Amino acid sequence: MSVCPAPRSPVRWLHAFTLCLLLAVLAGCVSVPKPMAGAGEDVFSRVGRFAITVTESDGKQQAVQGGFAWRDDGGSYLLDLTNPLGSTEARVEGRPGMAVLTRANGERLAAEHPDALAEDALGSPVPVTGLRDWLRGRLMAGAAPDGLERDAQGRPTAFEQDGWNARLSRYDAQGPQLLVLQRQEPGRRILVRLVITQP
């Protein structure tokens, strides 16, 4: 994945979004990150694939895909992002008061909050905090959802939070195995698709 020099270009945005997910985010060669020190019973992990498409107002599209491995103990988390061949592109490590993104080339970005880290990298907001909840099949705390729909078991299946329209489906015991997130911004529409391949 190459980075274009224009800071707001679709390719740069896609590249940075991929590194931050991730938002979020992916294929069969991905391994689950090693257990975190002090991890307790609330450990949550997901492995899967992601696809991100940005459609500009003129109809031009940019797309990127890859794999992710997410491990979260409720206090801290690790997110490894891979390219389609399985090579690690980035690792995001977060805990209260600190989020660090380390790229494969060793470059590091840090912020006090994961959403701030994503915004620094992308130039626009990304709901990293929301993904922590949405991957578990629950609503993000502190942000009232619009258009909330639930399945027969009471699990959220469709809603809008923090500017993102979310559809969650194919639930297993840990949460949804398919997440489709859409966001409309001035001049572009962002579509993020996450498919869980391992619990």
Curated annotation (Swiss-Prot):
**Cross-referenced SUPFAM superfamilies:** Prokaryotic lipoproteins and lipoprotein localization factors
Topology versus the membrane:
Lipid-anchor
Keyword annotations for this protein? Answer: Cell outer membrane, Chaperone, Lipoprotein, Membrane, Palmitate, Protein transport, Signal, Transport
Lipid attachment (S-diacylglycerol cysteine) is at 29
The main place the protein resides is membrane
List this protein's GO terms for biological process.
Answer: lipoprotein localization to outer membrane; protein transport
**CDD domains per the UniProt record, alphabetical:** LolB
User: What Gene3D superfamilies does this protein's entry cite?
Assistant: Lipoprotein localisation LolA/LolB/LppX (2.50.20.10)
Q: Which residues form the signal peptide?
A: 1-28
User: What domain of life does the UniProt record list for this protein's source?
Assistant: Bacteria
- Give me the Gene Ontology terms describing cellular component: cell outer membrane
Q: Where in the cell is it found?
A: Cell outer membrane
InterPro entries recorded: LolA/LolB/LppX (IPR029046), OM_lipoprot_LolB (IPR004565)
NCBIfam families for the chain: lolB (TIGR00548)
Subunit annotation: Monomer.
UniProt protein name: Outer-membrane lipoprotein LolB
Source organism per UniProt:
Bordetella parapertussis (strain 12822 / ATCC BAA-587 / NCTC 13253)
Instruction: Identify the coding gene.
Output: lolB
